[in-house]
Structures are given as C-alpha cells and as structure tokens.
Amino acid sequence: MSHYGRIKLLLEQHGLSPNKRFGQNFLVDPSVAPRIVALAGIKAGDRVLEIGPGVGSLTIPLLQKAGAVTAVEKDRKLLPLLRVEAAGVGALTLVEEDALLVDYTALAQQLGGPLKLAANLPYNISTPLMVHLLDHHAAFECMALMFQKEVAQRLAAEPGSKAYGALTVQCALWAEIRHGFDVPPAAFLPAPKVTSAVVHVQMMRQPRVAVEDERHFVRVVKAAFAQRRKTLRNTLKTICPDPNRWLEQAGIDGALRAEVLTLAQFAQLANTPMPTSAP
C-alpha cells in the first residue's frame, strides 16, 4: 500500500478527516519528512519540538532519529491516533494546546534547554505563529519549517523587493534564514492550491543589530509597513506626532518607503528618541 493510501486508511479507521478550521493539510509524500529531519539537523538525544503533528507523517521520522519528541497539537481528535502510531517507536509527549498560546520559553526550560523545531505549520496561522516563535527566540536552537512558498519568500527577502515586509525585518533581527526545498501540492492531503517551501531558521544568541527596546522596534516596523505605498513621513504619523523631525534626527530620508530600509536603519530609527509633541 502506498503511503498516501495508508494515511487515508488511517484516517478512516479513526473516523477522521482533515479539518479545514485547523488549517490541516496532512503530509502524504514519504520523501518529504526525512528531508525536513535532515534540514533541522536532528540527531539522537536532541530536544525536539513539533507543531501540528497531524497524523504523524513527520513525527515518526523525528522519533526514529531523536528518540523523543514533544508535539503541540490543538486537535484533540488526533491525539489517540498519534499515540498509536508512536507506540514502540519513541517517547512522544503530546501537548494539547493552541500553538499561538504556548509559552515556548517555559517549555524549553522544562525540557532542559533550547529546542530544535521541525514542523509542517498550519497555513492559516503560519505568519502570526512565526512572530510568536520569534518572541520566544531564546527557546530555540534552530527550526525547519514548512510554509506556503509566498510566506517563506517573505522571511528572507531583500530590501527593495516585493516580498520584503515587517515579517522579514522581525526575522532578520534574531535569525538567519535560508531556503531548503520546495514541496508540491500533491505531497499533501488535501492538496493545497499553492506550492509550499521548507526553510531552515538558525536562531542567534544575540540580535544582529542593537535594539534598545524590542517591543518598540516591532511597533515602529509594523507602523512603517502598514501602508506600503506611502512614504515614511506619512506612515509613521500613526505613532509619532512629528515624524519629519524624528526621521531627520535618525538620519533617514522621510521621502523613502519602508520597503527600502535595512534592518540597521529600522534599528537606528527605533533607537532614536521619538518627539512627544507636534511641530
């Protein structure tokens, strides 16, 4: 029986089907999971985390390599299936929780140190989830993550490109990201309408540039990109009463758009005291 056929039969036996509300697209191509495991550099004894294990297509190869895996799964209907699949393979710890609400810093401390994360992320939450993971950057050593290709391209885009945005800048502060490989729609059940891509994310112990207040930095970046076609002096009006003076003090041309600013320039702006009154 093909791997695809086995997954379909497994779902039928447990009375399950992919849940659109949870953004479930189960991996049915057996060649993909080993490549994700390899990209993440998983080895025996690693502290491994998976988000959205689904029917275990990636979970089992992770268990075979590491011996133990902690997996965050929101859909409680999948938990019995996962326990059956993992029996005799390795030690699987299931955390029934919304991945967007997990305190990954606390989880890493509980497991003994930084984690290696491997995941076929639910597409409907992939962007906010990536931001949440970045908020807990110290909890991770590295990641191998599957996104829609369009989202994956945004993570490591260059200034001036169409894909460059707030998410790119946030990622650049704490991570080195490289493209791993593309995955066609036929690798999933159900098949999505778009191509997917797996990226490798290497977390850094120190930020790439000095940022005095990270929350303020993120607020500045989001405000700058909120209206992409507008200049900085216009987009930053939402958070600063005198953006022209602020930009001038930071040494940044207010006629520029956010999409051309580098990470260093965003840090420079965020680190420059903001005027508290209008001109």
UniProtKB/Swiss-Prot annotation:
Its EC number is 2.1.1.182. It catalyses: adenosine(1518)/adenosine(1519) in 16S rRNA + 4 S-adenosyl-L-methionine = N(6)-dimethyladenosine(1518)/N(6)-dimethyladenosine(1519) in 16S rRNA + 4 S-adenosyl-L-homocysteine + 4 H(+). PROSITE patterns: RRNA_A_DIMETH (PS01131), SAM_RNA_A_N6_MT (PS51689). One of its GO terms (molecular function) is RNA binding. Belongs to the class I-like SAM-binding methyltransferase superfamily. rRNA adenine N(6)-methyltransferase family. RsmA subfamily. Specifically dimethylates two adjacent adenosines (A1518 and A1519) in the loop of a conserved hairpin near the 3'-end of 16S rRNA in the 30S particle. May play a critical role in biogenesis of 30S subunits. GO terms for cellular component: cytosol. Keywords: Cytoplasm, Methyltransferase, RNA-binding, rRNA processing, S-adenosyl-L-methionine, Transferase. This is Ribosomal RNA small subunit methyltransferase A. It is found in: Cytoplasm. S-adenosyl-L-methionine binds at residues 25, 27, 52, 73, 98, 120. Pfam families: RrnaAD. The gene is rsmA.
